[in-house]
From Swiss-Prot:
Matching Pfam families: Cytochrome_CBB3
Single GO MF annotation: electron transfer activity
Gene giving rise to this polypeptide: petJ
Function according to Swiss-Prot or TrEMBL: Functions as an electron carrier between membrane-bound cytochrome b6-f and photosystem I in oxygenic photosynthesis.
Entry's Gene Ontology BP terms: photosynthesis
SUPFAM superfamilies for this protein: Cytochrome c
PROSITE patterns: CYTC
Protein name, per record: Cytochrome c6
Keywords: Chloroplast, Electron transport, Heme, Iron, Metal-binding, Photosynthesis, Plastid, Thylakoid, Transport
PANTHER family reported in the protein's UniProt record: CYTOCHROME C6, CHLOROPLASTIC (PTHR34688:SF2)
Post-translational modification: Binds 1 heme c group covalently per subunit.
Major location (coarse): plastid
Binding site for heme c: 15, 18-19, 61
Organism encoding this protein: Chlorolobion braunii
Similarity comment: Belongs to the cytochrome c family. PetJ subfamily.
Length: 89
């Protein structure tokens, strides 16, 4: 099971520069809100699609595969999913 505490730490240290508070400082409409993830993420709103995006990047977002390990990617994906699913952003 993914570690949400690890995911939050990874998010805060690596993702928050562009995605603080679930937003997007580069492309404002492409937030980490559930509706935006459903609309813009290849594969829709699910853990696998979030993992794919983190690993491979897209557009202005860099690929994190090789920069974060498997547990870190799983954790941050679970954290993003949990925050968005619960409208916690």
């Amino acid at each position: 099971e993914a570690d949400l505490a690890l995911g939050k730490a990874v998010f805060d240290g690596n993702c928050a520069a562009c995605h603080a508070g679930g937003g997007n400082n580069v492309i404002p409409d492409h937030t980490l809100q559930k509706a935006a993830i459903e609309q813009f993420l290849d594969g829709g709103f699910n853990i696998e699609a979030i993992v794919y995006q983190i690993e491979n990047g897209k557009g202005a977002m860099p690929a994190w595969d090789g920069r974060l390990d498997e547990d870190e990617i799983a954790g941050v994906a679970a954290y993003v999913y949990d925050q968005a699913a619960g409208n916690k952003w």
